[in-house]
Amino acid sequence: MSLSGDTLAVGAPYESSNATGVGGDQTNNTSTSSGAVYVFTRSGGSWAQQAYIKASNTGPAAAFGHSLSLSGDTLAVGAYGEASNATGVGGNQNNSMATGSGAVYVFLRTGTVWAQQAYIKASNTGANDQFGYSVSLSGDTLAVGAPLEDSNATGIDGNGANNTATDSGAVYVFRRSYSGWSQEAYIKASNTEAGDGFGYNVSVSGDTLAVAAGYEDSNGQGVNSNTQADNSESASGAVYVFTRIGTVWRQQVYLKSSNSQRDDQFGYYGVSVSGDTLAVGAHGEDSSGTGVNSNTQGDNGAFNSGAVYIFR
């Protein structure tokens, strides 16, 4: 789900109609798990459905609606199972030769009417990269996670063609101008490694982007740990924060939890940035602490109880 003012968007990634576009026939369930999004608006104290939205190239197992983000009159929808081998913005949607490569669809509302504005793919589309597994929209900036992307690049705008780091993950940033959407950055972790899943969760707020790699393995703790290369805490997880000046992105900080341990998956299911505040969930954290700033972070007496960490 995503809420913006009096508008609520709800994803149903396993919905199965073969409709396309906005307001199609919902009753023909011949496209299994193609997915759909429902938009509701509030007037006074009452909610009503405003739109039923499908992909422009509906296909089985696309999971349209698995991720979505609403910002004012703009809605971004991820379909991580979409299968075309197109690249960039506005490519050929009908060539299903890259299974699970994924796509993102942007819709714009004028008055009460929704219409598709853009069809977006990765610049280095690859089968099973799952582009669109996560999306985050802030004004004219869109961040898209592809957690199973395979390149061994690091940092900003590296070489995305060398697929020797399987499922390391990547994030793509797009920006809207008067002429439409275009890719602004291709982002990888500073310590890219196979299986880290960089991009399983993304959150953008203005010129700040937070990216989770829930399967990152380092044994570091806290802010900017210098042990990124020590992979002795499997799936402990990490979050990377990037900032933009003009059109240039750079990594600002590398974050681990203060009590980072194996299988905590810090950031995997939850990361949210708003202004100067960042919240990160770790659903596999095991401490028996309760409330705020418990002093029992090292007591692993409550298996998978989970925790949330706030950074500023």
Where are the regions a protein language model picked out?
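Conserved beta-strand/short-helix segments
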Residues: M1-R312
